Amino acid sequence: MNESFFFLYEQGNSIVDRNGYRSVGSQVFCPCCFKSMDLRSRLIKRIHEEEVRLFASMAQYSFDDREFGEFFQLLYDEETRVAENVAWIMSHFNKAGRERLNSRKQLIMAEAMRTSNATKLRLLLAIILRQPFLEEEIATPFLDFCFDNITSSAQPIAIKSLSIYLSFQQCKFFPELLQELEATLHSCDGMPLSPGLRNARTKVLQAIAKTRKDIDRNELPRYHRQVLS
């Protein structure tokens, strides 16, 4: 469905199906023409979880390449809420949506390193974590950025935890980088950690140990993201 998105209007609590209208409380979404300016005018407002899932579904399956590109560009919008909402929507993408984002992964990394918005950064890191990492595309600036987040006392716990996982995804190809990451995580020994941060640290230390065994057996590292889920 080209040049389409969701049009929002009031229609009580009508029951709707997936092929027609779909309600979110008293609001009903229906597929119809929705130009970029209309999309932005909706995303500048507060949206809710169910709306986010609907927007994600449309962006993944109904947008052509041009429309998807226009949607992605809103990630850079000067209005904080617009940019945050776009990142929130993309964080709900399934495999189809993540594949559409793969060619833009470096752009998302660059924006993560640029933004000073903690909410947006957390969402971007979550998006990046769900992307595949290849040995030949590991970028030193982003890896350094993740390491800095781990050791920064100013970063929120969620960002530190995501950075731990992302650091492993990049270091897993290189024994010397795994050693550096392990040392960084052990530098927290004896320090009080939140449950989330402690869990991330434990899982990645276990992943490092498993990956090192694989390398020692001259096998390719097989301990990928699924072990961290």
Give residue ranges: language-model regions:
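Alpha-helical scaffold domains
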Residues: M37-S229
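Generic early N-terminus positional signal peaking at residue ~5-7
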Residues: F5-F6, R42
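Short coil/turn motifs at helix boundaries and re-entrant loops, enriched in small/polar
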Residues: G25, K35
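Cysteine-centered motifs
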Residues: C30-C33
